[in-house]
From Swiss-Prot:
Recorded GO CC terms: plasma membrane
Record-level Gene Ontology MF annotations: ABC-type zinc transporter activity; ATP binding; ATP hydrolysis activity
Originating organism: Alkalilimnicola ehrlichii (strain ATCC BAA-1101 / DSM 17681 / MLHE-1)
Function: Part of the ABC transporter complex ZnuABC involved in zinc import. Responsible for energy coupling to the transport system.
InterPro entries registered for this protein in UniProt: AAA+_ATPase (IPR003593), ABC_transporter-like_ATP-bd (IPR003439), ABC_transporter-like_CS (IPR017871), Metal_Ion_Import_ABC (IPR050153), P-loop_NTPase (IPR027417)
Catalytic activity: Zn(2+)(out) + ATP(in) + H2O(in) = Zn(2+)(in) + ADP(in) + phosphate(in) + H(+)(in)
Name listed for the protein in its UniProt record: Zinc import ATP-binding protein ZnuC
């Protein structure tokens, strides 16, 4: 079943394939007189990895918040599968150093209904050896894995990750993206990744959407987006011969088109 999150009176029900998790059509968000998202179309399906790239302020995080139901004030149509379970890993997570807490205690603070998969989530995220460590003493990569484990407690259909590789070195990025691929394959979930840099896009990405000032400039496989004139005009000053996209295995897919 595919349930409508929000539907203006004049709009019809969104059709959806059995594998569709979330879908947006003509999505527009404004803050006062300022547009944040403009006429965005997007579909995320089970087992698919979709990455949103763009500079700061391009609307990436707002789009994720609308798709996951956090923001409900918008125009256009957004639908999601009935009973959709969402796991979210934020970019920033503040830990109060005056309130020491172990990883084990942090994991068990989850809502009671989500504790049934506690051991499984801990194992899948690779944090079993961290359970007795204080949260305040974790490295950036360790903290990301703990937050991922917590997001897995609900066995999500959709996993949303906001800048998961930010602040990690190259080795840490590779380890994190391998872990995300493992989770995607094991759970069969869709994955929505936010990034400001196409060069950090994970190898398993099926589709990249490049946003700027709330508009989709282009979309497609990582290589096609990186070669697109709109993308190069936006990031060209930062592109050089040393930059490269992670190796990408992709079957026949759509090329880069204007949103």
């Amino acid at each position: 079943m595919f349930g409508l999150i929000h539907n203006p009176p004049h709009a019809g029900r969104l059709p959806a394939a059995a594998t569709t998790l979330v879908e947006a059509r003509g999505l527009t968000v404004r803050r006062g007189d300022q547009p944040v998202l403009c006429n965005v179309d997007l579909v995320v399906e089970s087992g698919q990895v979709v990455t949103l790239v763009g500079p700061n302020g391009s609307g990436k995080s707002t789009l994720v918040q609308v798709l996951t139901g956090v923001i409900r004030d918008y125009r256009g149509q957004v639908g999601r599968r009935t009973g959709l379970r969402v796991g979210y890993v934020p970019q920033h997570f503040r830990i109060d150093r005056n309130l020491p807490i172990t990883v084990r205690r942090f994991m068990k603070l989850a809502p009671r209904g989500r504790r049934g998969h506690w051991a499984e989530a801990v194992a899948d995220a690779g944090v079993s050896q961290l359970l007795d460590r204080p949260m305040q003493g974790l490295s950036g990569g360790e903290l990301r894995r703990v937050l991922l484990a917590r997001a897995l407690l609900s066995r999500p259909h959709l996993l949303a990750l906001d800048e998961p590789a930010a602040g990690l070195d190259q080795r840490g990025q590779g380890e994190l993206y391998r872990l995300i691929r493992h989770v995607r394959d094991r759970y069969g979930c869709g994955v929505l990744v936010v990034s400001h840099d196409l060069n950090l896009v994970m190898a398993a990405t099926d589709q990249v959407l490049c946003l700027s000032e709330g508009h989709i400039l282009c979309r497609g496989a990582p290589e096609s987006v990186r070669a697109h004139p709109e993308y190069r005009a936006l990031f060209g000053a930062h592109l050089g011969p040393e930059t490269a996209v992670f190796p990408h295995a992709h079957g026949p897919g759509e090329g880069c088109t204007h949103g």
